[in-house]
Regions:
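Non-transmembrane alpha-helical segments in soluble domains
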Residues: 45, 49, 120, 131, ...
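Fungal secretory targeting signals
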Residues: 1-15
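"… SH3/SAM/PH, and C2H2 zinc fingers" -> "… SH3/SAM/PH, FHA domains, and C2H2 zinc fingers"
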Residues: 100, 105, 133-136, 215-217, ...
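Bacterial peptidoglycan biogenesis and beta-lactam-recognition machinery
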Residues: 121-125, 238-246, 255-262, 307-315
Length: 575
């Protein structure tokens, strides 16, 4: 039996309470106009005002910490933050006298995300050995350079050393001796990049030094953080394009996006947020700029976040979605690593309606500077936090923004879904006898639910569940009586009744029943797996998938609905 063969290929073994990755509901539109979101942002601003005035107990000297925060929405026209907050530390004596969206900060390893973007738009082969572009690496005795690709370098899975030269802390030489380490000659240190001993590395010195260094891990085995990998990426892009890193940033990033502040350090002192005391501001990072030596601003990073969220960057929408994916696990149940995203799945961001929310981030740091660039793609939300001063402040400020405003965005999203999607649709008035189709959706604490679907006097929802249960349920977990639906991001502009509307394809998703516990070792162990995604698109009726439905939206308002497998035609709101 063909169906038996196909379902066996799925490998269904367990029943699960799970949902597809990605948006649970349509991303919020006009988020900045929502009163509840504005109220949350105002409350957060008051909290930061109190914190900066020393009225909130925090583990850092508030008089030394400047910071800027921006929140960006995908549906904005130009990437201008829908909310921003800036504070200049009272102890600052140098740099700008007013911190705003155009003020410059060192952004540390956010540079890696920018270097990865440059790599993606440079038109290079990502899955060939890096030695295609940097042949000097070929003659290594220690590293398997012919097994290391550009994608592995950008995804932190190449096993390349963290640094070359920089990790030898020459200024601690006497400390090592006092601790009982054996004395060594200066000649035993790397010939470049050792602060306090020698000059920064040239491209040739870096490649030669890394060629002969020890690998950190076997290539491709797991993530191992590397700064040097991104210097190699920039050198490979230079070999391919003829542009040095400064030119790459200007031509492939700043000009296309209209950025004015993003460049390799040193930046512009008059626009800089410079903390009191010693810091990395003004440093020339040289060949290390691609890994952590860029300066930027809230205005620039907001534009970049908007372009990624709105799929308007130089990458195609499919390439952008693929970029925002993990490439390896990071050692915990909730963390993974991308290219070079630091990806975290939060279970508690939306307290009123808990569900896993994935945040794609890149953090950065330099002496007295820390930064965070995060995308909450499910809500089309970008968060940028830049700090100058005590480096502990960033985590607390970022967590406050993330927890307050993602929860606020979720509430706006659910309110909109309840008003526009959780409704009844029908094609009453059909000329064909007994062919009136009625569909009704409700919204529970998790998602939209298909609560009723009929054609004439037939209960199609009951029949739908029966078809899925009898054809697929026997090979895996039982199908429950709850059928959910989720957006697919397959949206397009079409003309309906002479008007341009947005066609949204959704997929139905049956909840699965957990198997009965039995008195055997390991019973229930597989319940944490999520195999619901394997059921999609399995059953068709005359070429139309039984799980595919379509909403048609005019602006932010749902105008009509269609069930192609019922040949319903356009259905209007009936309640």
């Amino acid at each position: 039996m063909k169906l038996l063969t196909l379902c066996s290929a799925i490998g269904l073994t367990v029943a699960l309470d799970c949902r597809p990755e990605g948006p649970v509901l349509p991303k919020p539109a006009n988020l900045g106009d929502a009163a509840s979101f504005r109220h949350a942002a105002v409350g957060l601003a008051h909290t930061f005002d109190a914190m900066s005035a020393g009225k909130v107990d925090v583990p850092w000297p508030v008089e030394n910490v400047s910071f800027s925060v921006a929140v960006v929405s995908a549906d904005q026209e130009d990437g201008t933050p829908l909310w921003q907050y800036h504070h200049r530390a009272n102890a600052n004596v140098n740099g700008t006298e007013k911190v705003d969206a155009d003020s410059q900060y060192l952004v540390g390893s956010i540079s890696k995300m920018i270097t990865s973007y440059i790599l993606l738009v440079a038109g290079m082969e990502l899955d060939v050995p890096v030695t295609k572009y940097l042949p000097r690496l070929n003659s290594s005795k220690e590293m398997e350079w012919d097994s290391i690709t550009l994608r592995m370098l950008a995804s932190q899975t190449a096993g390349v050393p963290t640094n070359y030269g920089f990790s030898d802390y020459y200024f601690l030489k006497d400390v090592y001796l006092a601790l009982g380490f054996p004395p060594i000659d200066d000649s035993e240190y790397p010939p470049c990049g050792v602060i306090g001993l020698n000059e920064g590395c040239t491209a040739q010195q870096l490649e030669t030094g890394l060629r002969d260094s020890y690998p950190v891990i076997a290539p491709g085995s797991r993530p191992a953080y590397s700064n040097a990998a991104f210097a190699l990426i920039a050198l490979a892009v230079e070999a391919h394009t003829g542009m040095n890193y400064t030119q790459q940033v200007e031509e492939l990033l700043s000009k296309p996006f209209g950025l004015t502040a993003t460049r390799p350090s040193p930046g512009n002192d008059s626009k800089a947020v410079i903390p009191p005391g010693q810091s990395s501001w003004g440093a020339d990072y040289g060949i290390n700029a691609p890994q952590g030596g860029l300066v930027s601003s809230i205005a620039d990073l907001s534009k970049l976040a908007h372009a990624i969220l709105s799929r308007t960057a130089a990458l195609s929408p499919a390439q952008t979605r693929q970029w925002l994916k993990p490439s390896s696990y990071a050692g915990s149940m909730s963390s993974s690593v991308g290219m070079p995203w630091e990806i975290r799945r939060y279970a508690n961001l939306t307290v009123d309606n808990p569900h896993p929310v994935t945040v794609y981030s890149k953090g950065g740091g330099a002496q007295q500077y820390r930064s965070q660039f995060s995308l909450v793609d499910e809500y089309g939300l970008g968060i940028v936090v830049l700090t100058a001063g005590d480096m502990h402040a960033l985590t607390y400020i970022y967590d406050a923004v993330l927890s307050v405003l993602v929860s606020a965005a979720d509430k706006v999203t659910r309110k909109h879904a309840k008003a526009e999607y959780a409704r009844q649709f029908s094609n009453r008035g059909s000329q064909t006898p007994n062919s009136t189709v009625m569909v009704e959706f409700t919204l529970d604490d998790d998602s939209l639910i298909l609560s009723a679907m009929s054609r004439g006097s037939s209960d199609i929802l009951e029949g739908w569940i029966k078809v899925f249960s009898e054809s697929l349920g026997m090979f895996g977990p039982k199908i429950s009586g709850t059928v959910r639906l989720f957006p697919t991001e397959l949206n397009e502009k079409v003309t309906l009744d002479g008007e341009v509307v947005t066609k949204e394809v959704w997929r139905l998703w049956p909840d699965l029943v957990a198997p009965t516990a039995v008195d055997l070792p390991g019973s229930g162990l597989a319940n944490g797996d999520c195999l619901g995604w394997t059921l999609g698109d399995w059953i068709h009726y005359g070429g139309e998938p039984l799980d595919r439905v379509i909403f048609y939206r005019k602006g932010s308002h749902v105008a009509s609905f269609e069930v192609p497998f019922l040949r319903s035609g356009m259905m209007k709101v009936s309640s």
